[in-house]
Amino acid sequence: MRKPLLKARQLLLLAYLLAAVLWVVRCLVGCGVMLNYKLQGKMPQTHVDAAELVTESFAPYSSNEWWTPPDDDPAWYLSTDSDPHIYWQGQGYIETAVLDAAHRLPPGGVALYYLKPGQTDYSEAQKVYARVTAPGVYTFDLGGQWVTGLRIDPDSVGGVPTLFTGIDLNPARPWYTRFVPTAGWWLVLAFVPAVAAAMASAVCSFFIKKDS
C-alpha cells in the first residue's frame, strides 16, 4: 500500500503556513494600493465637522426652539425618526471612517453605506457595521474602496440624543495594524486552512486506496 506524501498533521501545518503567506501578501498588496492613491492625493485623511455634512432626520437641537438638549453643548443632535442619515458628499479612496457620536440612549444598529462610481442609490450590498473602538467612537472598516459618497445611519430607533462632532476619514494608525486580522478574518484564517487540509487528506487517501 502506498504511503501518502504528507501526513494529516503535515498537511494541516502546510495549510496554515500557506494561509499566513497569503494573508501577508494580501496586506502588502493593500499597502501598495493605498500608497498609490495617497501619493496621487486621492486618499482623504481629514476630520469633517458636523456642519460640513448633510443630515436627514437628524438635526441639531438648536434647529428647534422646543427641543431641550441634555446640556449646553451645541453639538447635540436628535434623530427625528428611526432612519436618520448623515451624508458625506465627496469621493476618494477610503479604508476606514470613524463616527464621533456619543449617544445618550441605546442607538440600536449603527451602519455605513457607500457608493461606487456610477451608483446613485445606497444598498444593503455595500453596508458596513460599526465597531465600537472607544466610548462614542464608531469605526467602519471598508477594506479599501474608491467611493463617491458615504451614508452613515447613527441609530436605528429614533428619538436618540447624540453628541455629534463629525467624522474622520482614513485616520492615521500604526503601520503594523494593517497586518492584524479583524474578528471575521481571524475566523477565516482559523477554520478555512483546517477544512482545506482535511479535504486534501481525504482526497489523497481516496486515491491511495484506489491505486492499492
Question: Which residues fall in each region the model found?
Answer:
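Short, hydrophobic beta-strand segments
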Residues: T139-W146
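Extracellular ligand-binding interfaces
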Residues: F58-T96, D100-T139
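Glycan-recognition and processing domains
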Residues: L5-Q91, L163-W186
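Short beta-strand-plus-loop segments that form exposed binding edges in beta-rich domains
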Residues: R151-G159
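N-terminal Lys/Arg-rich, disordered targeting/topogenic segments
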Residues: M1-L6, K210-S212
